[in-house]
Amino acid sequence: KLNMSTEQKITCSNIWKLFGPDEKRIIKNLDKSLSIKEVQEKTGHVVAVKDVSFSIQKGETFVVMGLSGSGKSTLVRCISRLIEPTSGTVKMDDIDVTKMSNSQLLDLRRNKMSMVFQHFGLFPHRTVLENIGYGLEIRGSKKDMRVDKSMEVLKMVGLDGWQNNYPRELSGGMQQRVGLARALAVDPEILIFDEPFSALDPLIRREMQDELLKIQEKLQRTMVFITHDFLEAIKMGDHIAIMKDGEVSQVGTPEEIVANPKDQYVKDFCEDVPKYKVLSAGKVMRTDCCDETKNLFSKKTDCIMDNLKIETLIDKLVDSDKSYPVVCNETGDLLGEIDRSIVICLLYTSDAADECDSV
């Protein structure tokens, strides 16, 4: 979705979170090969996050998804230290967040990080503008600066003209826009979203997703986005971490996960995904090319870049009975061929990526 930096903004290493009266002692002597159920039976402690490691690049949207109880919200709260991890490290810009003092942590949350929750948490006695400027207010910013910045982000989220209204006068979707604007007003480097749109009606939810994608395209902040909805995950995320029982089952781009689900749990999530919207020509092409395709390639005619999504090629391919050469976006080399039989397979089969290999 974005041209992300290769710089790592957030790095999580071997994060564990146990809930119980003696978690620090238990983790030191814990047999890490035990299942969550076995740990609870042997120690009386509940494992919410189990040995999770991943990195998030600067400027990307990293989605953490899973079913209720999978540990996704607990994990993200460990990243921000709203919950203290039992063991492991969280680094932001190579600074160990788990070793920060309370004052350092407060400074991090005021100046570098913002969070948007499912429940908006707006102050009912404050106007929209005053709610948006709250983070700047506790930071100590002057009133003129707060008003100017709040008006700027108010327009960014599509609420221009509502600055003097109160939260009770706004719809749920509008209130969530205020919550988003409040998070953006402090110019955070990192934005954390905990199922921000799950309580909204489907149409409003889609509007908010599109709004956030536009904002991200403009600002290119590092975003961590929690959801239980796989369709939302593939729409919003540059990378997705899928969680089950406190562990990360698979991390990858939406295309990598849909094309090559690691196990049945991940495959079940991919079941209803419109694969033609996720997969690119390079993922579903045939690597053996016919003479006609080779001839087209030699003439540099009708070549299709390997990174183009099938969704953008449907009209071209379905209306033609010929095969098209698929070329590498970076080098221009011939990689394979694609034709309408592959597109039709993607449109009408559930395990499209697998079945198209045999077309």
Question: Language model features by range: what are they?
Answer:
Residues 28-38, 95-96, 137, 144-161:
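Conserved ABC ATPase "signature" region
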Residues 80:
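Helix-to-loop junction immediately C-terminal to a conserved catalytic motif
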Residues 88-96:
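Conserved ABC transporter NBD signature motif
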Residues 166-170, 174:
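Conserved ABC ATPase signature
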Residues 185-189:
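A short, proline-enriched helix->beta-strand linker immediately N-terminal to the Walker B motif
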Residues 245-246:
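Conserved ABC ATPase "signature" C-loop
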Residues 348-353:
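Conserved small/polar residues in nucleotide/adenosyl-binding loops
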